[in-house]
């Protein structure tokens, strides 16, 4: 049943995200464990930053974990405003919202790790960054 809801949610999620600012990364042959990664950050009314990371592993049985941070650049360095973690088998979609202040550059900083199964052997890990000014 969970997979049915994922399949129903994916087209809707993609349509919404296409209207926002995103960065897509497709797998190379030597990018073990990953098939596709999308990361995005957009700003809504009243300063709501909507940010997300989606990981599609190269096999649907693989488990992926996303560690995602929203950071603001000020004083010459990046400051973490909020962070969280989400893990799932097959497609892993993790989105958050956080209110921010205008006049800064923000970034989504996500580390994605792919495992053979939940609690299983690590296959690969990579970091993805997307910046946007508000």
Per-region residue spans from a language model:
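Short beta-strand elements
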Residues: 118-134
């Amino acid at each position: 049943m969970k997979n049915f809801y994922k399949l129903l949610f994916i087209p809707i999620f993609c349509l919404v995200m296409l209207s926002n600012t995103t960065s897509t990364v497709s797998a190379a042959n030597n990018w073990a464990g990953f098939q596709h990664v999308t990361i995005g950050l957009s700003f809504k009314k009243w300063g709501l930053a909507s940010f997300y990371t989606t990981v599609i592993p190269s096999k649907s049985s693989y488990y992926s974990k996303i560690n995602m941070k929203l950071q603001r650049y000020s004083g010459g360095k990046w400051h973490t405003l909020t962070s969280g973690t989400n893990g799932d088998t097959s497609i892993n979609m993790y989105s958050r919202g956080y209110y921010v202040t205008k006049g800064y550059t923000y970034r989504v900083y996500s580390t994605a790790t792919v495992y053979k199964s939940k609690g299983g052997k690590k296959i690969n890990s990579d970091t993805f960054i997307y910046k946007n000014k508000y």
